Regions:
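Charged, terminal alpha-helix-loop-beta segments
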Residues: 1-125
Length: 125
């Protein structure tokens, strides 16, 4: 996974217990440039609006438990297999926390793009 400048890894599957409820953050970073904690939630399938509710809860807990004076509010990213951009933007309108949704390509798909196809390999043999 490649990130932009300023990211420092803080942990994966980071556990927080808030008011008797368990929260498990998939990936936690701190961005020195943004001066913010950054949560990345990894999802195997397509985007679902419920992911934003989960992410909003994580951001609230992080801002209460981890954020220190001088830091900006925590930022959240849902990383899922695919998402309808128009639908994501529509759903995000009512959220006030800094959140976004991004998509990924699985390693297998990426490898298929990079490797020669079966016919090209046969020609080489």
């Amino acid at each position: 996974m490649t990130f932009g400048r300023g990211f420092s890894y803080m942990g994966n599957q980071v556990h927080y217990d808030k008011l008797g409820h368990d929260h498990w953050v998939d990936l936690l970073f701190f961005n020195r440039i943004l001066k913010s904690l950054v949560v990345i939630e990894l999802k195997k399938g397509s985007f679902k609006p419920a992911y934003l509710g989960q992410l909003a809860a994580y951001l609230r807990v992080l801002d209460d438990e981890e954020r220190i004076e001088g830091e900006n509010p925590s930022v959240g990213i849902v990383l899922c297999k695919d998402a309808d951009r128009a639908y994501v933007e529509y759903v995000l309108q009512d959220y006030t926390k800094p959140m976004g949704v991004a998509t990924y390509k699985s390693s297998q798909e990426r490898l298929r793009e990079l490797l020669p196809d079966e016919e090209e390999i046969k020609k080489l043999l």
